[in-house]
Amino acid sequence: MQIEKKDIRALSKDQLRDFFVANNDKAFRGNQVYEWLWSKGAHSFEDMTNVAKTTRSMLEENFVINHIKVDTMQRSNDGTVKNAVRLHDGLVVESVLIPTETRTTACVSSQVGCSLDCNFCATARLKRMRNLEPGEIYDQIMAIDKESRLYHNHPLSNIVFMGMGEPLMNYNNVIKAIDMVTSEEGLGMSPKRITLSTSGIPKMIKKMADDDVKFRLAVSLHSAIDETRAKIMPFSKNFPLKDLREALEYWYRKTKSKVSYEYVVWKGINDDKASVDALVKFCKYVPCKVNLIEYNPIDDGEFQQASEESILAYIKALENIGVVVKVRRSRGKDIDAACGQLANKEAEV
């Protein structure tokens, strides 16, 4: 039976060095190969021209180099770009370039489909097929960086893990990808320009704090009332708000980093005074800011955007206690690239 080869880009630099030592070669070969894989973007071992042919053959026998392919690219009227990204096994994920006047942001995926079941999100309708490898996450970012340079004449300025999947359920691979992006071999981007958005898994938020991560944390909250939140995000029954609160307090004690709350206001769901009051109370637990996000429909109309009056009620109440509030008007809606709309429509093509 043929043994499936491992993607070499899943190895760290130290693991590559150890591999060469274990195979009676010099440790510095690991540095050479690592540079080819990440800084130079080698797509095959034959590309590694300063590596001996016998060494390349040994790598070929033990590993593969899996790269993504941008199958389709759509540009929105507002300049947003959505990529349908084909993986080595034929599965598809989506990633988005979001431009503004001052910066370009990559919205990247961490899973094929999603492990969770948020009722308002198109991705949740896709069962989770698998986690993305570090290289697959990194390649999404590099593809968007190229598009940023092409269309906007400057490199990518920010990254948000708000695409397909729950990043904290693919934690190790997401961390490896972030480490590569922030390294000299990658984009050399400051971790402060990277935001990981989670639906709120308390034990993993605590783990991030213990790991002393330097990137920013956003939580998809959508309600500070357990019963309401469970209707919006059924999985949250397993993670009550008191546990989330405790984890966020722990996060702030360890990191001193503010939390961002992502919050959509829906008609008849969380647009009442009790919901506003509950969020105001929740925002007092740790220093935070709130992003009120325009809702993006996913065909069936079950969830409807609340009135401007309802949104203004949230803004007024939060600003009264000194919380910074931003209203996020979604971009890329005409190409299904906005928040909650990523759903692999290209996968069937």
Swiss-Prot record:
Binding positions for S-adenosyl-L-methionine per the UniProt entry: 165-166, 197, 220-222, 296
Q: How is the cofactor bound?
A: Binds 1 [4Fe-4S] cluster. The cluster is coordinated with 3 cysteines and an exchangeable S-adenosyl-L-methionine.
Q: What is its EC number?
A: 2.1.1.192
Q: Which GO terms describe its molecular function?
A: 4 iron, 4 sulfur cluster binding; metal ion binding; rRNA (adenine(2503)-C2-)-methyltransferase activity; rRNA binding; tRNA (adenine(37)-C2)-methyltransferase activity; tRNA binding
Q: Which residues form the Radical SAM core domain?
A: 100-334
Detail the disulphide connectivity of this chain as listed in its UniProt entry: 107-339
The EC class name is: transferase
The protein's matches in Pfam families, at most eight in alphabetical order, are given as: Radical_SAM, RlmN_N
Known CDD domains for this protein?
Radical_SAM
Q: One biological process GO term for this chain?
A: tRNA methylation
Which PROSITE patterns does this UniProt record tie to the protein?
A: RADICAL_SAM
Record-linked NCBIfam families: rRNA_mod_RlmN
The record's misc note reads: Reaction proceeds by a ping-pong mechanism involving intermediate methylation of a conserved cysteine residue.
Q: What does this protein do?
A: Specifically methylates position 2 of adenine 2503 in 23S rRNA and position 2 of adenine 37 in tRNAs.
- Return the protein name: Probable dual-specificity RNA methyltransferase RlmN
- Species this protein is from: Flavobacterium johnsoniae (strain ATCC 17061 / DSM 2064 / JCM 8514 / BCRC 14874 / CCUG 350202 / NBRC 14942 / NCIMB 11054 / UW101) (Cytophaga johnsonae)
